[in-house]
Regions:
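Active-site loop segments of alpha/beta catalytic cores
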Residues: 1-7, 15, 93-345
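Active-site-flanking structural segment that lines cofactor/substrate pockets
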Residues: 4-37
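Glycine-rich loop at the start of a catalytic domain that most often binds anionic cofactors/ligands
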Residues: 11, 48-63
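Solvent-exposed, flexible loop/coil residues
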Residues: 22-23, 74, 277
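Catalytic domains of carbohydrate-active enzymes, especially glycoside hydrolases
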Residues: 25-47, 168-177, 239-246
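A short acidic, glycine/proline-enriched capping/turn motif at secondary-structure boundaries
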Residues: 47-50, 119-121
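A gly/proline- and charged-residue-enriched helix-loop-helix capping module
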Residues: 63-106
């Protein structure tokens, strides 16, 4: 099963108009689920959406938003400004995103799955260099000690505010689960050496913020589907499991049959075919996709862990490569895995 709404969206004549039209976007989500034979209707993934909404509220020109980063702590007044703005009519794209969830809930027999970026990953998009201050925080420095640590803390506070608002709105729209993509919670942004030395930085920053989202979901009886396609170690995977997701989606760098040893069996593993590379036959061919799908299918069967064969992340459209990508998605969705192509260890 792919997370493929973006691919289907860009098959349409007017994708830019669709993403601000909730019913039209909902129909794209519905078409995606029905095409790939799944009852799970995953909302469109746009990991720039919440950043755009947040910075628009703070008065950043629309044309500057994609490359914009805070140069310093915007202060407590920024938090107040965002909180007040979220009580007013929403950004058209965010409203359409929420309305697409409502369309699935009200107009179809599919299971509506909401979508959000994780607060930690959103924070990293707001800073030019998030790695250094995260490291400083992991070494014990606080916002009072260093202005860059103060900036990380403020950016995370703002990120959590917008994510919680989006998730709450999607819950009201009828979402039965929320897919939270937290790709930056990985060994690039958080030092494994600091963790090994006893730092609680991973728990304090990504996991601590994610627990706030999880608490909101629990309050409303909504499930968490957690995704991270970044480079991870086993400690990080175990920490993700403490969030008690019903599904854990990991990137292609992980061997899911090995992760099955550390992930509780009440958490379904999802993935993790390298869909980021489907755009190029020079990187991966259709035949290789089929082989990887068969190998993963059979290794997971041997592991005896609940599993959904899927893409490692959402399958993004790449201009001029749409047909190639779609062909590889079809290859693993419709692959008849008989075990003959399983690679022997």
């Amino acid at each position: 099963m792919p997370i493929g709404a973006d691919l289907v969206l860009h098959e349409q004549a007017n994708p830019t108009a669709i993403v601000i039209d909730g019913q039209a976007l909902g129909k794209v989500v519905e078409e995606t689920a029905r095409r790939y034979g799944t009852p799970l209707a995953f909302a469109h993934m746009d990991l720039q959406l919440e950043k755009a909404v947040l910075l628009e509220i703070l008065g950043i020109p629309v044309t500057d938003i994609p490359l914009y980063h805070f140069s310093g702590d915007p202060g407590a007044e920024a938090v107040t400004r965002v909180r007040e703005a979220l009580g007013k009519p929403l950004n058209p794209a965010l409203q359409a995103h929420i309305d697409s969830v409502a369309y699935i809930a009200q107009k179809t027999d599919l299971v509506p799955i909401g979508m959000t970026i994780g607060p930690f990953s959103l924070m990293t998009k707001l800073l030019k260099d998030p790695i250094t201050p995260i490291y400083l925080a992991g070494s014990g420095m606080t916002a009072d000690d260093d202005p860059d640590v103060a900036l990380v803390d403020r950016a995370l506070e703002l990120s959590l505010l917008i994510v919680l608002h989006s998730v709450a709105a999607q819950i009201r729209a009828g979402a039965k689960a929320i897919f939270m993509a937290e790709p930056a919670a990985n060994i690039v942004y958080v030092s494994p050496k600091q963790i090994e030395a006893g730092s609680d930085i991973f728990e304090r920053y990504p996991i601590g913020a994610d627990r706030r989202v999880k608490a909101l979901l629990q309050q409303h009886g909504v499930d968490l589907i957690f995704h991270c396609c970044g480079e991870l170690n086993d400690y990080m995977v175990r920490q993700f499991c403490t969030l008690e997701p019903v599904i854990l989606s990991l990137g292609s760098s992980r061997k899911l049959w090995e992760d099955a040893r550390i992930v509780p069996k009440d958490i379904v593993l999802f993935g993790n075919l390298p869909s980021k590379h489907f755009y190029s036959d020079a990187v991966i061919t259709r035949a290789q996709v089929e082989q990887l799908a068969c190998e993963l299918f059979h290794r997971m069967a041997e592991a005896g862990h609940p599993f959904i064969l899927g893409s490692e992340c959402d399958v993004l459209n790449v201009p001029d490569s749409t047909a190639v990508i779609r062909d590889k998605v079809d290859a693993f969705v419709r692959c008849q895995c008989d075990g003959s192509r399983v690679v022997q260890a």
